[in-house]
């Protein structure tokens, strides 16, 4: 399986929106990706800021399998970012996002010189917990009513990976 990362661009807008449409039931209550052209363009605008990096996880034939974003990147003494990610139907559950996340983690630590990545995951989202666990993240705690998704404040578990832990796993 040869997964690669691409930077989201306007040329992939329609393909992205179709993948989101096809994946609505998979994403329901877990994530709210851009669903309209206007929202997608807002997403691209956000990615143009220094505090955000976006990655499309692509199959060898360039099909979109998922998205992994580094959000709220803080540099200086903190050098940290929050992860946001989601797979697209029918590519979920096949290891593509795990392969993509390994590439994003390597890029975050080596290229962008970050020190820590954090993923906040709803406790019932066992697939997401398995994903970050497989890549080496550790559970740090529980945050009640942490993030508003689909109009509801939802509890989350806090998972993190530091560069030291990542290097020790290699």
What residues fall within each predicted segment?
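Acyl-donor (CoA/ACP) binding surface of acyl/acetyltransferases
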Residues: 1-24, 59-170
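Juxtamembrane/interface motifs at transmembrane-helix termini
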Residues: 34-38, 47-48, 86-87
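Conserved GNAT-fold acetyl-CoA-binding loop/helix
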Residues: 25-43
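A generic secondary-structure signal
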Residues: 43-46, 107
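Cytosolic beta-strand hydrophobic patch enriched in CBS
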Residues: 27, 54-59
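A short helix-loop-beta-strand connector motif used in the catalytic cores of GNAT acetyltransferases and
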Residues: 45-56
């Amino acid at each position: 399986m040869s997964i690669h990362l691409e930077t989201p661009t306007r040329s992939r807008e329609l393909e992205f929106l179709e993948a989101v449409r096809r994946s609505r039931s998979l994403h329901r209550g877990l994530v709210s990706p851009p669903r309209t052209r206007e929202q997608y363009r807002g997403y691209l605008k956000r990615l143009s800021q220094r505090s955000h990096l976006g990655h499309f996880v692509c199959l060898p034939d360039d099909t979109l399998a998922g998205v992994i974003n580094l959000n709220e990147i803080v540099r200086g003494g903190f050098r940290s970012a929050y992860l946001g990610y989601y797979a697209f139907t029918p590519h979920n559950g096949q290891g593509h996002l795990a392969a993509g996340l390994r590439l994003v983690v390597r890029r975050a630590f080596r290229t962008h010189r970050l020190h820590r990545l954090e993923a906040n995951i709803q406790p019932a989202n066992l697939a997401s917990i398995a994903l970050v666990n497989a890549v080496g993240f550790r559970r740090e705690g529980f945050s009640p009513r942490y993030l508003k998704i689909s109009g509801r404040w939802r509890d989350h578990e806090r998972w993190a990976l530091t560069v030291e832990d990542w290097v020790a796993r290699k």
